[in-house]
Amino acid sequence: MVLPTVAIVGRPNVGKSTLFNRIAGERISIVEDIEGVTRDRIYATGEWLNRQFSLIDTGGIDDVDAPFMEQIKHQAQIAMEEADVIVFVVSGKEGVTDADEYVSKILYRTNTPVILAVNKVDNPEMRNDIYDFYSLGLGDPYPVSSVHGIGTGDVLDAIVENLPVEEAEENDDIIRFSLIGRPNVGKSSLINAILGEDRVIASPVAGTTRDAIDTHFTDADGQEFTMIDTAGMRKSGKIYENTEKYSVMRAMRAIDRSGVVLMVINAEEGIREYDKRIAGFAHEAGKGMIIVVNKWDTIDKDNHTVAKWEADIRDQFQFLTYAPIIFVSALTKQRLNKLPDLIKRISESQNKRIPSAVLNDVIMDAIAINPTPTDKGKRLKIFYATQVSVKPPTFVVFVNEEELMHFSYLRFLENQIRAAFTFEGTPIHLIARKRK
């Protein structure tokens, strides 16, 4: 289920990032300290009153070389295009500025709910000054001190109040996948080649421009698929369409709804930092992964080309050791027929459950091969393990002391589990817990 989106807009130095961090809280921290697994600070998940939402700081999307008014105009346009709720941040210290009025006139034309947050109201005496902001015509202003956390609860109440009604859970029998990657890697050509030119025309689902475009199809075995592609990746001429951070934001919305993610790389251009960043988001989200090298027909090859590419990919994407690599051509349709079966196998791995008895046999065999570590004379004891969830498969290992479970030994156990069971194309998570 795709999360509703809340966009924070406003001119520089009004405290957008501080409010963003206050709402996002600890959710914004980096999950894994591995090169390529990064958390872009323009995008996070917020939660209030049991409602989750995606939070975007549009200020992080700005082209710093663009004229000032152009920057904030782009912010407002992106927010109107992407968001279900807009939080317009102004400064109580400076009062209403020309830039605030400029943005408010743009936002006034949208049907998207706008919450006016007057930030930097750091003491009670300043609350009287917020009434000047009624002149912006955006309703009641909310006094906030992001630094001290004052008033953020009221803003969050207003956000949740204006979020769209929660969608029903999607059919788990349908495999949902998305194609992500830099502009011009050939995502649209791949989509057309996979579906056939006559089928892609019928793909758009009625809705706003910020909705994902879903394409439904069924393979020869009767398996239903939904291919998820964001509107911004398919339509040309959108504001900031080709800027990296805007593409990141679009890609993450597609990742949210996908079970399997196809990371598309352009064989003509090789691997870029953007590729690693996007792949890192999908990995952190626990999605199934396929690395698709497109335009394979365009490069000169010898007997060592595939091996060199695979080695480079494994080196650049060290956190994706589980992801299969496939070399394709949207133009010639080379190997495209293999993708549906590969996606199916990865989806099955994502949903695989291992009986506890069988799992613990593997754990005991692993300990016999490589005994548990010791620290200051105390040895790690593993009592038992059990699988607690799927998508991705997640296992809890109950131990005497969590601190004794070194990262390297947890990785060893993961490798042993992977060797015993087929978990193709999916991350698996192992968590150490002290037995009570």
UniProtKB/Swiss-Prot annotation:
> What GO biological process, any one, is recorded here?
ribosome biogenesis
Q: Name the Pfam families on file.
A: KH_dom-like (PF14714), MMR_HSR1 (PF01926)
Q: Which Gene3D superfamilies match?
A: 3.30.300.20, P-loop containing nucleotide triphosphate hydrolases
Q: Which positions bind GTP 2?
A: 181-188, 229-233, 294-297
Q: Which residues form the EngA-type G domain?
A: 4-167, 175-351
InterPro entries (UniProt xref): G_ENGA, GTP-bd, GTPase_Der, KH_dom-like, KH_dom-like_a/b, P-loop_NTPase, Small_GTP-bd
Which sequence ranges are marked TM in the entry? none
Binding of GTP 1, residues: 10-17, 57-61, 119-122
Q: Cross-referenced PROSITE patterns, in alphabetical order?
A: G_ENGA (PS51712)
Keyword field: GTP-binding, Nucleotide-binding, Repeat, Ribosome biogenesis
Q: Which GO terms describe its molecular function?
A: GTP binding; ribosome binding
- Domain KH-like: residue ranges: 352-436
In terms of SUPFAM superfamilies, this protein maps to:
P-loop containing nucleoside triphosphate hydrolases
Q: What does this gene product do? A: GTPase that plays an essential role in the late steps of ribosome biogenesis.
Kindly state the subunit structure of this protein: Associates with the 50S ribosomal subunit.
By sequence similarity, the record places it as follows:
Belongs to the TRAFAC class TrmE-Era-EngA-EngB-Septin-like GTPase superfamily. EngA (Der) GTPase family.
What this protein is called in its record is GTPase Der
* Lineage, uppermost ranks: Bacteria, Bacillati, Bacillota, Bacilli, Lactobacillales
